[in-house]
Each structure stands twice: as structure tokens, then as C-alpha cells.
Amino acid sequence: MADSDRSAPNADPSALNAARRTREWDELSRGSSVDLLVIGGGITGVGVALDAATRGLSVVLVDKHDLAFGTSRWSSKLAHGGLRYLASGNIGIARESAVERGILMTRTAPHLVRAMPQLVPLLPQTSFFGKSLVRTGFLAGDVLRATARTPSSVLPRSRAVSASRARELVPAVRQADLRGALTAYDGQLIDDARLVVNIARTAASFGARILTRVGAYEVSGTSATLRDELTGTEFLLRARTVVNATGVWADQVDPSITLRPSRGTHLVLDANSLGNPTAALTVPIPGETNRFVFALPAQLGRIYLGLTDEAAPGPVPDVPQASDAEVDFLLATVNTALEVPLTRADVLGTFAGLRPLLDTGGGSTADLSRNHAVVRSATDVITVVGGKLTTYRKMAEDAVDCAVEAGGLNAGPCRTRNLPLVGAASRAVLDQVRAPAGLVARYGTEAEAVIGLGDDGLRQVAGLDICAAELAFAVSHEGALDVDDLLDRRTRIGLVASDRERALPEAEQAFRAV
């Protein structure tokens, strides 16, 4: 372990909390230096921290806000196998995505990722060409899965299903002249922000210092001024290498980086509005050959309907907002496949994220490469940008490889390909965990420990499938420092404003109980 654990005696070395943050801030402020400073607490940054810490390097990660504050919490929550990239001829990223999906589902995070069926209904407007294109794509996805060595017991093969079976999977699908459906399987995360937190905690268990509400200023390749955004105190941290993993804010740390962000928007619906589907209704976008709108069954009885791809020029906001045009587009597209059309009254909330795409020239943002890049600037800051949530581990590996070479660091080989995250276990082990299914899906083998927090730990919060013990665990183990962290990133209650309002008193109580 690169650094000794700084938690209390006998404490969980992966636990992140306010006391640990204060202790580690004080230690660093006394003038120590580290091998690697990581700026950015999204999926890429925490991935870099974990990779470096498990190679034996001393690591500090800082984020001005919170873990998963930016794009990492606004995804479709898919561990995507890369089928779209295959359709556009990008075989390399397609295979990389399939391999990384398999690693998540079978080794590193099987507790957080499940196989999700996607259903494309065969409706009167589905042409023979359209059907053939989808079927060919799904078969290609089967080949991708096989070449990535993900077993069919984890991700079943694609298949055609009858009209009656299609209605069982998606009860709201249009019934008139339904000619069956085509189904394929992909990986679905219980939540993207939860994956980020789990990676951060795993990094912490290997000695990485994870400091949120800490900004990095006057950044060079060997140092940065760190500021505690809660107190205003500052100090200079020296590091042998610095990695910029700030996503859509990367050019603020390294002005030589040129990004062209695109906005991806989702709507949040009540699962009842689609008859509580167990498959993701997948609707081709008219006029497009390899783009779809997905109605994704999600936790807490919700549906995430997305996604758009719109240019987002100008200043980068902390929290992007969906446009009216995007809301209308998503509703209009999914309604082509529904028996009863959705309206704006069915929309409980929206969320939008900005993709940190490298600017490679003209064309629409939908056509820009999703490849990641690792760039070393004139000031020796190493920036990792682009890519996809699914491929975070490989992005991190490439960034740390670059940092090791640039800084002449004495580091071991990458270990993250086979390293389980906190709570991870095989499906057979997870099935034996004595806790409600929702808790096991979010916490894996830690679910029993979560339940043990408080006498009324299983009491529901705001009438949702979230219990009071989860709020307590977020404060004691997951680095939540305020109610926004609890409601907007650790639990995702905040995606629906009315749910957030009802849960606010419970969230405030979780901090008073510390």
C-alpha cells in the first residue's frame, strides 16, 4: 500500500468521510509531496487514482465539488458494448467497449452491473431493410460479446421474440399489427455515480487520498495550489506528475486542449407510465441508421428516456439543462412505438450531461470520435479526455502509463483488470447476502453492513426504495459532506424534485446523527 491507512483503528480503510478528509488535508498541508496528483473526481479521475494507488504510487485526488459531480452522473447508466461504434466502422473502440463491459460484469463490479434486454418492436412502419439492419447489428453484437470472452450466461444472445412476449417485456408497446420484436442484451449499471464512489473508495483502501470540495489552482506538471473550498485555506502541493481528468472542464486546467462538448439529455418517467417494463424499449430515430431512443427501466421505479446529441458551445455550466426541443424530440420519438402516447405531464424530471469530445473538425457532434486521448502539455500536465464511461479503466491505465513514463516513477504493472471494487462478488455469493434486493444491487456484499447502521435502518425515505441506513452509510463511508451529495449523487433521489423535497428532512437528519 502506497500510504498507510489514516482511518481510525479497526475502521474500514475504504471509508470516506468528513473526519478522514480533515485529517488528510492537515497531513498534506504540512509539506509532504506525492507521486501523483489527480484533478477531477469523475469516473476517469477516480479510475486514475485507483490504477496508480494499486501500482504502489502515492496519490492525491481533488475535486472542487463532489465525486461524480459532472458528466459521470448524467449518463444513460449503461455499460455499453460498443455496438453503435461497430455500426460506424470504429472496430477498435467497439471491441474495447465490449472487453471493458465484460470486465465490469464478471470481475470488477458484477454487483453494480446487470444484463438488460433491449427490445426493438417490429411495427408496421418497420421496413424490411430496417429490420435486417437491426438484426445484423444485434448479431454483430453477439460476435463482439464472444470475442470479448463474456459468457452468454452473463449476457444472453440476441433473439427474435413473439408479439405476446414483446408485450410482456414492455406492456406499453403499440399493439396494433405488432409483428414481434428483436431483443439483444447490454450491461446496465444500477447507477453511474455509485460506480464512481465505489472506485474512489477502492482507491482509498489502497492509500489514495480522496479530497472533495478542494480546488486545484496554478497547476503545473509538478505542483498545484490546493484550496479547501469550505474554509478558504490553501497550500502548495508538490507532485512528481499531475493528471488532469476534469472532463468538460479540461481546457480550464490545460488551455492547449480544444473540446467540442455535446449535450445528452434524458427524461425521468414513472415506470407505471410504460406498464413497468423489464426491457428497454429501443426505438429507431427516424432518418438515422444507427441511433435510437431508449426507455430504460431504472431503480426507484423510474424510467430514463434518452438520449440526445446536441452541440453545446459556450461556457460550461455546473449543471447542464435540457432544452424544450430535446424534451419534445424524445417524447415524439418514443411515442411512435407506444400504444398510449406520453405527454409532458408524464415527465417527472430531466437531466443532461456534456460529453467531453475532442474537437476534430466539422460535422455534427454525433459524428465526433468517442476515442479517448492522453495528452502531455508544454507544462508537463497530463490530460486524459474523451472516451466513454464503460472504458474508464482502460483510459486510466493509459493515463497512468503516461504519468509513470513522464515522471520516471517506480511503479508496478496495472492491476485493475482483475481487481474487484468494494462490495463486488460473484452472483452466487450476492444471492446469499441477507438484505433486500435493492440494497444488494447498490452495495453488494456491503448491504448487510449498511442495514446495521441504526435501529430503524430499513425505514423508507420519501416512500422510495431507499432506506435511512443508506443515508447514514453515505455520510460515514461514501464521503457525503452535505445534503446535495446525499440526494443528488449518492442516492439519486434528487432526479425528481418532489421526491427530493420529501426526502430533505431525512437527509438533514443523517448529518445531525453523526
PLM regions and their residue ranges:
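Extreme N-terminal leader/targeting segments of oxidoreductases
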Residues: 1-36, 51-54
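C-terminal accessory subdomains/tails of enzymes that are appended
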Residues: 24-28, 33, 65, 111, ...
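Beta1/beta-strand and adjacent pyrophosphate-binding region of the FAD-binding site
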Residues: 29-44, 60
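Core beta-strand elements of the Rossmann-like FAD/NAD(P) dinucleotide-binding domain
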Residues: 32-34, 231-241
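Glycine-rich FAD pyrophosphate-binding loop
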Residues: 53-73
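Dinucleotide-binding Rossmann-like beta1-alpha1 core, especially the glycine-rich loop
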Residues: 77-169, 292
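A conserved short coil-to-beta-strand element within the FAD-binding core of flavoproteins
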Residues: 212-224
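Flavin (primarily FAD) binding-site architecture
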Residues: 244-256
